[in-house]
Amino acid sequence: MNYEVYCGNAHAEPNSSAVQQLAEACVEQDASYFDGCSRTCVKDKYLLPLTQFDNLEIVVYGQIFPILVLFAVFANAAVALVLSKKHMITPTNVVLKYMAIAELLVGLVPLPWTLFFFSMGNIKETHRLELWWCYLQKYSMDAFPPVFHMIAMWLTVLLAAQRYVSISHPLHSRSACNVKNVRLATMIITVTSFLCGLPKSFDYEYETVHGWIYSHGNWTYASSCVMMPTAILTNMGQTVYFNIYFWTRALGFIILPSFLLVLLNGLLIKGIRRAQRRKLRLLREKRSEEAARQRDSNSTSLMLVAIVSIFLIVNLPQAIFMGLLCVCETFTIKIPILEGTFPAVFLIASNMIVIATYPINFGIYCFMSSSFRQTFKLLFCPGASQLQCERRIEAASAVHSSRRRSDICSHLVNVCTNSEGFMQVSHHCLHVDYLVSDRQSTQFTTMDRSD
């Protein structure tokens, strides 16, 4: 089968009256377009423009998007690396790590197409269009990014639910929300998301056309991708096929998780306030160790509330938009705002905002988690971290005997964690009476701990 057709002079519009009559008769039959090359009326194929707003997309996808992705890749890769260290493995951190990987792929997968087509200027070279351009655009911009976004969406729900169980039912959380179960839930979310995203990969096949096309009353010299329905789409019917796909995506992966996130976020905030009152009561009762543990738990919960809230702020508008779009398409309701240029511009802006929030999560981790900061320094600034460790050991040698030995030890253990996942502690930390003796280093690992 010939997938690429070249014919006609791009600077000479067909002017034969016979061809014009054929073209007009074709359009009157509700055909897709009239092919001036083969002089055939095309009914089951559709032209697919690679862009809708050239100038806007050149700026957004060609200039802004690569910079945003660069920051997002660094931030999410750093988060995934830090949370992969053995001493950082907790149920909460496991979810955060997989969220970072999913969010990284949301930005990284479209990058080859945006660099090739927009940044490298091939948007102005469509006369060189080849078949692989069509498939690259489809899979990198349309098929796979929504799948990874679905995964990130449900992982955020898992994160909020896991944390709510941890603070509301701490005894049950150790068995129900352990690392093994969290990884199993992540696998189920990933597989389900890919299965629900598969229909988008099997809706159309492609060919290319280079020649004169008559459509909407005008002749156009087109170098364009042409979509052809697959056998699955033809047998099911386009209305049924796309209604199932978009309603599943809208309800199961946008509206429902958004509703659950609003609910769980509210419950988390309520739980944090209750835990704060408990901490104050423990302090009044002079149970300082329990109060310190409660403070750490509250800090983790506050960090997760911040992450979930940011995720909701940028994704709720998309949820509302997708819900309206599905209702209008299913019941053929006309809403002026959903016609014209608004939907495309809204989605472009919304996608950029989503990518721009990913580095913010990294900032939240650094600001609110001391263990994250320390592990990050050990991974990416090992020299500075070792110097800091040595200085604190020196400081410990000057501590008076009135200070508790456990205070010194816990202080050093918190800082001197090396990049291999080991905690590095001087013997002086373990035996405060011999702080002035020659230092020898001991290494030990922490056990996996639940929240």
From Swiss-Prot:
Entry keywords, A to Z: Behavior, Cell membrane, Chemotaxis, Disulfide bond, G-protein coupled receptor, Glycoprotein, Membrane, Receptor, Transducer, Transmembrane, Transmembrane helix
Chain coiled-coil ranges: none
Main location: membrane
Stretches of the chain found on the membrane's Extracellular side: 1-63, 119-140, 205-251, 323-334
Glycan attachment residues as annotated in the record: N15, N218
Cell compartment(s), UniProt: Cell membrane
Expression by tissue: Expressed in head neurons including the ASE sensory neurons and the ASI and AWB chemosensory neurons, the midbody neurons SDQ, and motor neurons in the tail.
One record GO biological process: chemotaxis
Functional note: G-protein coupled receptor for the neuropeptide like protein nlp-38. Plays a role in several types of aversive gustatory associative learning including gustatory plasticity and salt avoidance learning. Its role in salt avoidance learning may be through activation of the transcription factor crh-1/CREB and de novo transcription and translation, which in turn promotes the formation of long-term memory.
Protein name, as recorded: Sex peptide receptor-related protein 2
Lineage: Eukaryota, Metazoa, Ecdysozoa, Nematoda, Chromadorea
